[in-house]
C-alpha cells in the first residue's frame, strides 16, 4: 500500500473516525510520511454545532444510541448534507467511501477551519479539550 501511495503521490490519508481505523490497521506506517484527516472530527467541527444540523437531527430523530444527544455519525451527516431523511448507510467499503468523500467535500466547500493530523478522540481529550464538545442534547433546553 505504501508503494502505491508513493507512486501516486498520495499526500493525505482520510477516513471517518481515523482513530478506529488506525487502531485496527496493520498499515500504520501510511501516516509516517503523510498527513491525515479525520472526516469525523472535520464534520463535527464544521457542522455539529450548527443550528440547522441540530434542528435536522432533532426533527428527524438522528440521535445517539443513548438518545441523550444528537447523532454525529457518517449516516446522520450525509442525510443532513443531502437532505435525505430516508438515507440508510449500507456499510460496505465502497458505499462508505462514497459518503465519506461527499462529507469531506461538503466540509471543504464550507471554507471553515478544521484540524489535521489528529484523531477525534485525541482532539477531544487534548490538554484543555472537552470530550463532550460535540455532544449536543437531543432535546432543546
Regions found by a protein language model. Give the residues of each.
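Metal-dependent phosphoesterase core characteristic of DEDDh/y 3'-5' exonuclease domains
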Residues: 5-140
Amino acid at each position: 500500500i505504501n508503494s502505491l501511495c508513493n507512486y501516486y503521490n498520495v499526500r493525505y490519508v482520510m477516513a471517518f473516525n481515523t482513530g478506529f481505523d488506525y487502531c485496527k490497521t496493520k498499515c500504520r506506517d501510511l501516516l509516517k510520511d503523510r498527513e491525515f484527516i479525520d472526516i469525523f472530527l472535520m464534520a463535527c467541527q464544521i457542522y455539529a454545532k450548527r443550528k440547522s444540523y441540530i434542528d435536522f437531527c432533532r426533527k428527524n430523530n438522528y440521535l445517539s444510541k443513548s438518545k441523550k444527544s444528537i447523532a454525529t455519525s457518517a449516516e446522520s451527516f450525509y442525510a443532513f448534507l443531502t437532505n435525505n431523511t430516508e438515507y440508510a448507510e449500507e456499510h460496505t467499503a465502497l458505499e462508505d467511501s462514497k459518503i465519506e468523500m461527499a462529507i469531506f467535500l461538503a466540509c471543504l466547500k464550507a471554507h471553515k477551519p478544521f484540524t489535521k493530523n489528529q484523531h477525534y478522540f485525541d482532539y477531544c481529550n487534548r490538554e484543555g479539550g472537552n470530550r463532550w464538545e460535540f455532544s449536543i442534547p437531543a432535546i432543546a433546553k
